[in-house]
């Protein structure tokens, strides 16, 4: 592992994170909100949803996402590294993991219905996915879909894509620059290609 990346892993200020999500079919053509909403988690639900807030998103602008007269809602709740690891550990017990997801889906559905009474009885859970889901699909250690959350007053540093002591190894990953994500991963891939082309050019010139 590059020294700078190892240093970030060891820096307590640099936080790794993941998230868990719920998707609901909404039996209503009209919604009481548009776009994204930040919803506070009431105290009585925080044993099941241990977060201050979650993001609620609607997709009415995507006409092909739901039949006419209906909508799709999706929630996203961020979680830190420890909680992400608990999800991954729990997923080894299929029954307990399924029950945990059902509790989350029910709690969040109730929170939404309390916030928007006009949606009460009109939501049906389609799916719940967690850090364990991301780990299963992309083999990310804690289900990270981005790298590190940047602390306040911190500038993201771009690390070199070469590892000292390893010949012909070029890294292309979101972890080379916080906060990661798809654009940085794509840029990292472009930089890896440029590095390879430079090396090949030197070899052909020599």
Task: Kindly give the residue locations of the regions a language model identified.
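Mid-domain catalytic core of redox enzymes
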Residues: 1-68
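Short coil-to-beta-strand
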Residues: 69-80, 165-167
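A generic secondary-structure signal for well-formed alpha-helical elements
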Residues: 29, 83, 116, 196-200
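Acidic/polar loop patches that form or flank catalytic/metal-binding clefts of enzymes
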Residues: 30-37, 119-123, 201-205
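A conserved FAD-binding loop/helix module that cradles the flavin
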Residues: 166, 174-200
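Short acidic/His/Gly/Ser-rich catalytic and metal-binding motifs that mark active-site loops
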Residues: 82-88
